[in-house]
Amino acid sequence: MSLSRVSVTGVRNLHPVTLSPSPRINILYGANGSGKTSVLEAIHLLGIARSFRSSRLLPVIQYEQPSCTVFGQVDLAQGGHSNLGVSRDRQGEFQIRIDGQNARSAAQLAEILPLQLINPDSFRLLEGAPKIRRQFLDWGVFHVEPRFMATWQRLQKALKQRNSWLRHGTLDAASQAAWDRELCSASDEIDEFRRAYIKALKPVFEQTLSELVELEGLTLSYYRGWDKEKELSTVLASSIHRDQQMGHTQAGPQRADLRLRLGAHNAADILSRGQQKLVVCALRIAQGHLVSQVRRGQCIYLVDDLPSELDDNHRRALCRLLEELRCQVFITCVDQEFLREGWQTETPVALFHVEQGRITQTHDHRE
């Protein structure tokens, strides 16, 4: 799948624009602050209904504009296309449209337009809180396991009920036991989905990483959120008093984590920033491979400021891997010469110059 048209209005400093990107490689170049990252942000908004630069959408709306809107036409792998639209106004009203119909949730967008983001904050996947790694893990499971979303919703409902009971004691013993059974059932299913996903991801990640950088002894493992030798029901029963003191459930899938270690050490503690970025790139490219194996279609990659923290050899290796995925890629850089050359002659490459919010296509992939 790929975006064949993108229209952006009212997003940060960008002038209203409609782009016809290449189905493969798209390079956006221009000075810092010109609006390159805002283009990626608009596409991210279209696919996830969230910004990767701000936890709130209000700052995304252009100054003195009533709203921001992004439309896109997605060419589907199975043929045909789908029209997506996302709009948010200053009063907080949010609208998601898919083929002319209001969508129920952002998950419907994500299913049609799977996005992967690689940017200067990518190292947070290694250094940041476990929540970031759970989001990475569950993105992958969501796109390859059709039962995941319904089970995840069951888990969240049961967990919410149990945490409410822990804080307020509003359930009788029979109701509490019923919700605990539901929580354990959903937790076991989520754990099964995640475990199967990591088993499939590990060899692809290891192969991808070996093509980017040599890091002997780097291992990827999965912690499910409770003792692997015990049933969750046993753990919950033994920790009930501590959970009541804390006011929330301390064991379960909501405490899961991915662990990357180099020998006996946490990888984030000893890898350079550039090495961390390469590890994250390998993880995200491996995810793209798995999506393409399970679904008819590819992820779309948003790569912001690719040259930063990578030398020429590693930059070329990363571009080669992205090219081999045969997916659509949007890459930003200051100088187009960093990225213009080196692609295969049969790979369609489009160039867009961004200056003070104005976007001009300087090379059409169809030429």
Swiss-Prot record:
ATP binds at G30, A31, N32, G33, S34, G35, K36, T37. The keyword DNA damage applies. It is found in: Cytoplasm. Pfam families: SMC_N. The keyword ATP-binding applies. SUPFAM superfamilies: P-loop containing nucleoside triphosphate hydrolases. Its main location: cytoplasm. Belongs to the RecF family. This is DNA replication and repair protein RecF.
